[in-house]
Amino acid sequence: MRNFDLSPLYRSAIGFDRLFNHLENNQSQSNGGYPPYNVELVDENHYRIAIAVAGFAESELEITAQDNLLVVKGAHADEQKERTYLYQGIAERNFERKFQLAENIHVRGANLVNGLLYIDLERVIPEAKKPRRIEIN
């Protein structure tokens, strides 16, 4: 696992302060780190978010994307019966996890495998924003 220190980029990145603020705000959300998640760089233009959602059925999960905000919600069905635990180490609470997406990041799909929710993202750069070669006369 790699951890990246982005602080040196603050000095040399002009106009990207909003991006860094989004990253910091995402880390400081008041949800206590539940559920835990990973963000993986698959390749230059593809990302994958993996969220640990053990105990949630596919029908109890909701994923929405609007503008640059990805929201993942998990809500257990109301029909769960009361249980008496001697020890409860597995969290069964409902959750809402928000991810601020950078511009041109699109959600391509999601699947639930062995208690992990995978959300695939792709960076799509419009033709107008791609670098173009300028001829010198």
UniProtKB/Swiss-Prot annotation:
Induction: By heat shock. Residues 28-137 form the sHSP domain. One of its GO terms (molecular function) is protein homodimerization activity. CDD domains: ACD_IbpA-B_like (cd06470). Monomer. Forms homomultimers of about 100-150 subunits at optimal growth temperatures. Conformation changes to monomers at high temperatures or high ionic concentrations. Pfam families: HSP20. It is found in: Cytoplasm. One of its GO terms (cellular component) is cytosol. Associates with aggregated proteins, together with IbpB, to stabilize and protect them from irreversible denaturation and extensive proteolysis during heat shock and oxidative stress. Aggregated proteins bound to the IbpAB complex are more efficiently refolded and reactivated by the ATP-dependent chaperone systems ClpB and DnaK/DnaJ/GrpE. Its activity is ATP-independent. This is Small heat shock protein IbpA.
